[in-house]
Amino acid sequence: MDIELFLADLEGRFAEQRRRDNDLLVEELTDAERAGVTLAARLLAVDGPVTLVLRGGRRLDGAVRDCTRTWVLVRGDGGDSLVPLGAVVGAWPLGRVAAGETGVKRGAGMGHVLREFAARGVPLVVDHDAGAHRGRIVAVYADHVDVEAGEGPVGDSRDWGAGARVSLALSGLRELRVADGRW
């Protein structure tokens, strides 16, 4: 037995095992890192146009203007849209890079935003699982809002008279737009 060949073979096997162990470690670390990355962080890192698919299948194309842990603000051809992150069921292109979770601000929650819309009497178009409604939010509760129909037909509020109210569950919100297109 040639001891030099024996040692070279042994070192080669150890080196190969180290490479395999390192590859496995890199895979495990990558998986662990990805497990902590939220959709909000990836949306915040998008530089350029993005397409969101909302619950129900509607596509929204535009640029991410702002994003918190609960909502994303997208500017598209039709103006700005405030979308609860829970309503986003698909998005592209997101790329591989994500903003650090520390970059995703806690920001005002959806309830706070809705209360501010109500306080200011902002005319909105509310896209909801129960249909599209044009009007003003007049009350915000723990899990739903009351919307008072405004002027002009939009979606499912077309048959309402001005001033009629509907209560909409927050879990069904898909998108909010200012009725005249300007925030």
How should these model regions be labeled?
Residues M1-W183:
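Short glycine-rich, low-complexity segments
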